[in-house]
Amino acid sequence: MSLKLPRNWDFNLKVEAAKIARSRSVMTGEQMAAFHPSSTPNPLERPIKMGWLKKQRSIVKNWQQRYFVLRAQQLYYYKDEEDTKPQGCMYLPGCTIKEIATNPEEAGKFVFEIIPASWDQNRMGQDSYVLMASSQAEMEEWVKFLRRVAGTPCGVFGQRLDETVAYEQKFGPHLVPILVEKCAEFILEHGRNEEGIFRLPGQDNLVKQLRDAFDAGERPSFDRDTDVHTVASLLKLYLRDLPEPVVPWSQYEGFLLCGQLTNADEAKAQQELMKQLSILPRDNYSLLSYICRFLHEIQLNCAVNKMSVDNLATVIGVNLIRSKVEDPAVIMRGTPQIQRVMTMMIRDHEVLFPKSKDIPLSPPAQKNDPKKAPVARSSVGWDATEDLRISRTDSFSSMTSDSDTTSPTGQQPSDAFPEDSSKVPREKPGDWKMQSRKRTQTLPNRKCFLTSAFQGANSSKMEIFKNEFWSPSSEAKAGEGHRRTMSQDLRQLSDSQRTSTYDNVPSLPGSPGEEASALSSQACDSKGDTLASPNSETGPGKKNSGEEEIDSLQRMVQELRKEIETQKQMYEEQIKNLEKENYDVWAKVVRLNEELEKEKKKSAALEISLRNMERSREDVEKRNKALEEEVKEFVKSMKEPKTEA
C-alpha cells in the first residue's frame, strides 16, 4: 500500500515558526508564564499606575476593555478590576513606546503602541500592544510612565540627566542641559517683569511643538514673539519628565527632613541641607545650583512679577523634589517640607552653592590611575571620551572595559620603550578629553588581544574583590592560584614570538633570539622579573597550551563577572523589597493614626451629643414637674366650687 502526499504541502519551517509565534501572541497570562519567568505579579510591589484602557486584539483587530496595572518592570492586564490572575503581561525594559497619529475621521481615539525589544520578540514571539486611552491627557500620562519604566531613549525629554549632559559635551562644555540654558536665558531676558511667571500655563500646542523639536535633535531658537509662559512651561515639563528627579529618590527623605528642621532650628537645617547637597551626583548638583540662582534672579523683581521666593518654591519645588511613589497622600504630606527647603535653597544659594564648585573637575592624570594602563601613541585602539563623573556602577563597568584599552602587544608603554619614554611627548588631559573616537592603526591579531585583555582583567578582578560589599566565591580563589602560571605562559609566549604591528612582514633568520633578549632586558628593567634564557625556544605544543590557558582564564574572569553581577542584582532586589516593606509599614502606621484621629473625633462628638441629651432630659423633667403642679392646681380649683355648692 502506498501513501500519497498532497501536492500543495509546504515544508518550509518559516511558516510553522510564524504560526507558533502567532499562537504565542494570544496566550493567556498563565501560559505566558512559561516563556517569561517574572510574569506573576508580586503583591508586595506597589503599582506605579493602573487604569482602564482598550486593547486591540492581534487577529480580529477589535477593541477590548481591560484593566491595566503597571508594576515594577511588567505591564499586566486583567479582565476586571477585582481579578487577581492576569490575562497577560509584557516585559517593558528595552521596549519602544510611541504615539500613533489617527485620521481626522477617527477623532476621539487616543492610540499608542508598545513595541517589544527585538531580542524579546524573537524569543517569545510576542506582537506589539496597541492600546487606546479615553483622553489625550490619560494617554500622555501612560506614555510617560511606560517610557520611564522601559528606559528607552526618547530624545531630550525623558532622558536621564547624566546621559544628556554627557551627550551635549560634544557641543562644548555645559554644566547643565542646553534646553535649560536656552529657557533660562530667554526668561531672564523677556520674563522678569511678566506677572505670574511659572504660575500661569503656556500654550499646550506650542509646548508640544517645542518638545518634539528638541526630541528630534533640533535646537530651536526662541524669537521675540515666543510666549514667555510657554517657555516656562517647557522648562517645567523637562524637569517633570526626567526619569529620576534632580533630587534622587534615595535622598528624598533627607531633603524632607531638612524642611522639617527649618521650623525648629534653621541653622541645623542648613547644615543638614549642605550634607545632602554634598552627596548629590555632580550633574544633579550643577543643575540644582543653576536653577536656584536663576530663580533668585527672577524673585528680585517680585514687586512686578508677583512671584516671591515662597511662590517660586511652591511652583518649582515639586518638579525638582518628588517621591518615587506618585501617591496623592504622599505628595500632599511632603509638599510643605519641599516648599520650605526650596525656599532655603533659593534664598541662601550663595552659601549652599558657592561658585567655586561650578568649575568642572579635570580628569585625573593617567600615571595616577592604577586601574587603567596608558595607551601609547603608537598603539592600536580608539581614543575614547572620558566621563567627568565616575559613579560606583560606572567604575565597575570601566573595569570590564579596561582590558580593551591596554597595549595590543600585551605590554605597558613603559615596557615597550623604557629608554625613550622620557623623550616621547605626552598629551595633556585636556587634549584627549574632548576628542571623538578615532581609529589610529590597524587591529591587532587575536593572540595580542587576549594577552592584553587578560592583564586588564586580572587587575580589574583584584579591584572588584577589594570591595567589602561583594563576597568572593571559590572561583575567585582559583583565579588567584593561576596567576603565576599565567605569567610564566606570557614569558614563554614573549620569548617565542614578539608580535609586531606589521605581522605580514617576514622576520630575519636571526631576529627571534635578539628580540627575545631585548624583551627580557626591558621586562627586567621595568618590573624586576627574571626571565628564562633567550636561547631557549618553545615548541608549537607549548604555544597552544598557553593560548588554551589564556582562554580558560578569560572564561573564568567572565564567569566571575557574571556571578558578581547576579549577586549585585540579588542584593538590589532585596534592598528594594525591604524599602517597599518599610514603605508599606509606614503607610499602615499613617493610616492607623488617621483612623485613630477619626475615632477620637467621633468619641468627642458622641460625648457632646450625650451631654446635650442629658441636658434636654433634665429640661423635660423640669417641664413635667411644672405640668404636674399645674394639673394639681387645676384639679383643686375644680373641686373647690363643688364643695361650696
Swiss-Prot record:
* Domain PH residue range list: 46-151
Pfam families noted in UniProt: PH (PF00169), RhoGAP (PF00620)
Give residue spans, biased composition: Basic and acidic residues: 420-431
Keywords, sorted A to Z: Coiled coil, GTPase activation, Phosphoprotein
Q: Which CDD domains match?
A: PH_RhoGap25-like (cd13263), RhoGAP_ARHGAP22_24_25 (cd04390)
Residue ranges of every copy of the Rho-GAP domain listed in the record: 159-353
Chain intervals for the UniProt region annotation (Disordered): 355-444, 469-550
Q: Which residues carry this modification: Phosphoserine?
A: S362, S395, S536
Q: Where is this site: Arginine finger?
A: R199
User: Do you know which PROSITE patterns this protein is assigned to?
Assistant: PH_DOMAIN, RHOGAP
Q: Which SUPFAM superfamilies match?
A: GTPase activation domain, GAP, PH domain-like
Q: Which residues form a coiled coil?
A: 541-644
Phosphothreonine modification sites are T406
Gene Ontology CC:
phagocytic cup
The biological processes this protein is annotated with in GO are: actin filament organization; negative regulation of small GTPase mediated signal transduction; phagocytosis, engulfment; signal transduction
User: What Gene Ontology molecular-function terms does this entry list?
Assistant: GTPase activator activity
The biased composition feature labelled Polar residues covers 487-504
Bias kind Low complexity: ranges: 393-409
Instruction: Tell me, in a sentence or two, what this protein's role is.
Output: GTPase activator for the Rho-type GTPases by converting them to an inactive GDP-bound state.
- PANTHER family per the record? RHO GTPASE-ACTIVATING PROTEIN 25 (PTHR15228:SF20), SPERMATHECAL PHYSIOLOGY VARIANT (PTHR15228)
Protein name listed in UniProt? Rho GTPase-activating protein 25
